[in-house]
From Swiss-Prot:
This is Malate dehydrogenase. One of its GO terms (molecular function) is L-lactate dehydrogenase activity. Belongs to the LDH/MDH superfamily. Its EC number is 1.1.1.37. Pfam families: Ldh_1_C (PF02866), Ldh_1_N (PF00056). The gene is mdh. It comes from Methanosarcina mazei (strain ATCC BAA-159 / DSM 3647 / Goe1 / Go1 / JCM 11833 / OCM 88) (Methanosarcina frisia). Catalyzes the reversible oxidation of malate to oxaloacetate. It catalyses: (S)-malate + NAD(+) = oxaloacetate + NADH + H(+). InterPro entries: L-lactate/malate_DH, Lactate/malate_DH_C, Lactate/malate_DH_N, Lactate_DH/Glyco_Ohase_4_C, Malate_DH_type3, NAD(P)-bd_dom_sf. The keyword Oxidoreductase applies.
């Protein structure tokens, strides 16, 4: 039986628990600092199991001790973006929150794999790794799966085809300098540049980069949670099933892509040990330049941390 703990019972956390419960991993613990919220949502989700047909045990708690012996811990805690805010605006507040969260993960679930979802994603994942003291391959961030999903959705909409036929790839930082890769994006195996003109692809790339902000502006309060939770569960499933799926993730680089000592979105193999392998792709010069700028932004953010 697999035990999964989700830290943060807000929209992303609770929706993730719902999707995970339907996979029937065994046990899920949802924890939050707000008294009553994780307990109430857990009770609601347990009752949904009688209707949707899953027997997953779901516990809501305010006590970190309840995450003890978790196989997988998913961090969704922290404040969300508001209109006009960038992911980088969240550095100071969320780094303190996640530093505390990570310390409790190290204390109660020292053998777990950790997926971070809190923004600014690449910087906060670095905080989580440092604060837990875990090996870097056991701590990684959810970024590219979500960004690639948005890219794929826009492509399917443009081509009027099934989303199931689109396989997209997005790398780089989870922010304004992410790098969608049309040359590694296919529709039923057909490279995207064979199906759409360059100007159209550029437009879809731009919308992908601004995909999260577009939703924030429309919602006025809060940020996306349905697509992020779907992306989290895709990654979690690869870990708990040891399927070694090739997915983009924010991984700790030690020389790959010319970067060292930072977290960065790259294609990886995900399995029971976390990041089993980092895959390096040949990139165009313009894409390499954006990646360089993205890495500089991440390094600048890390330099502001007090860890």
């Amino acid at each position: 039986m697999v035990k999964i703990s989700v830290i943060g019972a807000g929209n992303v956390g609770s929706t993730t628990v719902q999707r995970l419960a339907e996979l029937e991993p065994g046990e899920i613990v949802m924890t939050d600092i707000v008294e009553g919220m994780p307990q109430g949502k857990a009770l609601d989700l347990m009752q949904a199991g009688a209707i949707n047909g899953y027997d997953t045990r779901i516990t809501g708690t305010n006590d970190y001790a309840d995450i003890a012996n978790s196989d997988l811990v998913i961090i969704t805690a922290g404040i969300a973006r508001k209109p006009g805010m960038s992911r980088e605006d969240l550095i100071k507040t969320n780094s303190k929150i996640i530093g505390d969260v990570a310390g409790n993960i190290a204390k109660y679930a020292p053998n777990s794999i950790v997926i971070n979802v809190t923004n600014p994603l690449d910087i906060i994942t670095y905080v989580a790794m440092k604060a837990t003291g875990f090996d870097p391959e056991k701590v990684f961030g959810m970024s590219g799966v979500l960004d690639a999903g948005r890219f794929a959705s826009f492509i399917a909409e443009e081509l009027k085809c099934s989303k199931r036929d689109v396989e997209a790839m997005v790398i780089g930082g989870h922010g304004d300098l992410m790098v969608p890769l049309p040359q590694y994006t296919t529709v039923s195996g057909i490279p995207l540049p064979e199906l759409l003109p360059e100007k159209t692809i550029d437009r879809l790339v731009e919308r992908t980069v601004n995909g999260g902000a577009e939703i924030v502006e429309l919602l006025k309060q809060g940020s996306a949670f349905y697509a992020p939770s779907a992306a989290i569960v895709r990654m979690a499933e690869a870990v708990i099933k040891d399927s070694r799926r090739v997915l983009p993730a924010s991984a700790y680089l030690e020389g790959q892509y010319g970067q060292k000592g930072i977290y960065f979105g790259v294609p990886v193999k995900l399995g029971a040990n976390g990041i089993e392998e980092i895959l390096e792709l040949k990139l165009e010069d313009s894409q390499c330049e954006i990646l360089k700028k993205s890495s500089e932004t991440i390094r600048k953010g890390i330099s502001k941390l007090e860890i």
